[in-house]
């Protein structure tokens, strides 16, 4: 579950995006910032979180690093997070913002776990079937997990559709155990 604080900041940024008709653009920029801080430049993220660095220095760093990378809205948003000591919530804010954007665009994200990588055709076919079932636009990310042996396990929200060989074998094993004992 996403943090209440992160939700509030995400809602504020989303509202700004709605007012300026730029919710998608703001999300792409927010995603870019989070990727940069969590994957590319972890040290920069540590500096922004550090209590040893003054807030004015942190805001100057944000201005310098992101001067050409993102809009002033995202830079100012980051500066507010720095001012309020909320920069550590950035990843949760991104997740909360994505949920708001998905809700606006009638999208549900799902995961299809399979033993081998699914083809693009299979993923698209699964997305179409699930979109029809849920009356929403379903986007699927394929994750490979060799422990499921075969088949597909689909997770969408709190729902799980289990079509894996492992589960079928486990059920057979259970039934055999009942018969034998």
From Swiss-Prot:
Its main location: membrane. The keyword Acyltransferase does not apply. The keyword Transport applies. One of its GO terms (cellular component) is plasma membrane. It comes from the Bacteria. GO terms for molecular function: proton-transporting ATP synthase activity, rotational mechanism. Gene3D superfamilies: N-terminal domain of the delta subunit of the F1F0-ATP synthase (1.10.520.20). It holds the Pfam family OSCP. It is found in: Cell membrane. Keywords: ATP synthesis, Cell membrane, CF(1), Hydrogen ion transport, Ion transport, Membrane, Transport. InterPro entries: ATP_synth_OSCP/delta_N_sf, ATPase_OSCP/d_CS, ATPase_OSCP/dsu. It is a peripheral membrane protein. NCBIfam families: ATP_synt_delta (TIGR01145), PRK05758.2-4 (NF004403). F-type ATPases have 2 components, F(1) - the catalytic core - and F(0) - the membrane proton channel. F(1) has five subunits: alpha(3), beta(3), gamma(1), delta(1), epsilon(1). F(0) has three main subunits: a(1), b(2) and c(10-14). The alpha and beta chains form an alternating ring which encloses part of the gamma chain. F(1) is attached to F(0) by a central stalk formed by the gamma and epsilon chains, while a peripheral stalk is formed by the delta and b chains. Belongs to the ATPase delta chain family. HAMAP family: ATP_synth_delta_bact. F(1)F(0) ATP synthase produces ATP from ADP in the presence of a proton or sodium gradient. F-type ATPases consist of two structural domains, F(1) containing the extramembraneous catalytic core and F(0) containing the membrane proton channel, linked together by a central stalk and a peripheral stalk. During catalysis, ATP synthesis in the catalytic domain of F(1) is coupled via a rotary mechanism of the central stalk subunits to proton translocation. This protein is part of the stalk that links CF(0) to CF(1). It either transmits conformational changes from CF(0) to CF(1) or is implicated in proton conduction. This is ATP synthase subunit delta. It comes from Clostridioides difficile (strain 630).
């Amino acid at each position: 579950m996403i943090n209440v604080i992160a939700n509030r900041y995400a809602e504020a940024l989303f509202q700004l995006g709605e007012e300026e008709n730029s919710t998608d653009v703001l999300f792409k920029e927010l995603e870019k910032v989070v990727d940069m801080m969590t994957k590319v430049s972890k040290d920069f993220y540590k500096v922004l979180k550090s209590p040893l660095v003054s807030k004015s220095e942190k805001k100057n760093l944000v201005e310098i690093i992101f001067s050409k990378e993102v809009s002033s809205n995202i830079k100012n948003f980051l500066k507010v997070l720095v001012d309020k000591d909320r920069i550590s919530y950035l990843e949760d804010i991104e997740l909360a913002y994505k949920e708001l954007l998905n809700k606006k665009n009638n999208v549900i994200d799902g995961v299809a776990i399979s033993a081998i990588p699914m083809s693009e055709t299979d993923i698209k076919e699964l997305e179409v079937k699930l979109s029809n079932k849920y009356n929403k636009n379903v986007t699927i990310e394929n994750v490979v997990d060799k422990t499921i042996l075969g088949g597909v396990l689909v997770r969408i929200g709190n729902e799980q559709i289990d079509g894996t060989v492992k589960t079928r074998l486990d059920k057979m094993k259970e039934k055999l155990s009942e018969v034998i004992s």
